[in-house]
Amino acid sequence: MFLQGLVLLSFVYVSTSTTSYSTSTSSCNKYKLNQNRCLENKDTETGEQCAYLSCNEWPEYACEPMYGCEIATYASSICQKNPSYTCHYSSNLASNPFVYTEEALLDQVTDLPGLKDALSYNQFSGYISLPGTQKNIHYWLVEAEQDADLKPLVFWTNGGPGCSGLIGFLTEQGPFRPTADGEIQMNPYAWNKVANMVFLEQPVGVGFSYSNVEDDYKIGDDQAAKDNLATILGLIEKFPHFNHSDIYITSESYGGHYMPTLANEIINYNDAQEYNAEKLNFKGFAVGNPYTDYYSGVGAEMETYWGKQLLPKPLWDKYVANGCTTIEQQLNNSVCSTLILNFMRKIGNLNPYALDYPVCLSQQQMTMRNYLKAELLEKGESGLLSADSFDIPYEPCEDEYSSTYLNRADVKAALHVHTDIEWEECSRTTKYELKDKMLPMEKYYKILLNSKTHPEMRILVYSGDDDSVCGTIGTQRWIYDLGFPLLEDWTTWYVDGQTAGYISKFKTPYSKDSRFTFMTVHGAGHEVPTYKPKEALDLFEKYLTNAI
């Protein structure tokens, strides 16, 4: 797809009109340009771009083998010998073996307001313009703290639907936390300790992402998957040194729809490519507390309340006797709806997304709550739950530090985003298809895990067990109903000698090892890294290194 050159210096990149090469001061060695495979600057086996130069043309510089073609490497003085090459320097870059395109350097974040300490890694923020559209998706890339060239490339997006990936950046697993005084506090459990992280604001209309076409803000699962794939491809085009990196996608909440549909889109894209070099090196996805199946997932919310002993036994017995444990009965049986209303009154003012934590719903939680509630409210005229049934005084608690910080003019300038866009955690501009919430995602898991062409792809579903809405009971239900045989059932995993949760592994075709894992995180709410940051980082690293 894109040529990845051999890199020996960290602060220089050399570009032509078509590609970029790395620099070296070593003398010419024994390698010769393979004329049999490299015809018309194309590798006949892989289709990759070949070097323009050979040792014969520039005998004082080395030629190195790369993917079957010999890549010419040369020192920056070549720019003086051949004016068709241009050298670009950035003294702000942290040391690493990457070579950056001019477009990438324009997005480099060199002076982040409130950040006092020098970073050992680079960060970039800007837009990926989607081909053939007027859609512009905002990304924020933070490289791995150490050995970035050896670490995978991981994309993160939040749920909602319609909530910003910068929620994850600033309140969950990103490297920074804005404070009340406008400073930046470092997160000791940031996920870029083990990966190059890209935080996306998608779909279009979310956060700083925008389009000049009003209809683009009407979107559903299928189009979101296509746009997210285009965003990944666009980012790798801007940062071609990631072309051969292992790629993972991650999310939570409505990511239970985003992740399997995007993974399926990537698989289809890869299968359509003629050359292996054009394929994404896709390794799988991880999703936390996923909204996967409206019926098996949401229907388990009341069971979680009972399991937490938040309900009296006589009321629960009546609920079971009337068959109310299925979502179908909850939606269509007036007795069940009345019992649910009684449950909510008995429970009182608790946060359903983090039952053992103070009452404080984030915007992402509120968005999911309203999205799921819509189905019940539509039944109001039939005698089921109506709008006034949800008069429990939940208080939204948008992270005001994040909103205040991101809406500062100097921060917007540092991030290279449109200054006239008012950043919100969850979009009021994006019009997401309500019908998509009823679509079960299990079929995608079966397609992906039965894929012959991608046996290396691994899926991790993790669940904070203090969440009732996208909780562990419902998640277990749909996972076990997939029918994959167990390899390992409910074993304990530990952090600092303490029980962090439980692991179940499933046998899938075309692999002797487990490609499908379920993990619980004990005591974590809906956004696992917010409530259990150390455990979340441990889980994430185990997944990336296949150490679960």
Regions found by a protein language model. Name each.
Residues 27-29, 34, 103-105:
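Intrinsically disordered, low-complexity regions enriched in serine, threonine, proline
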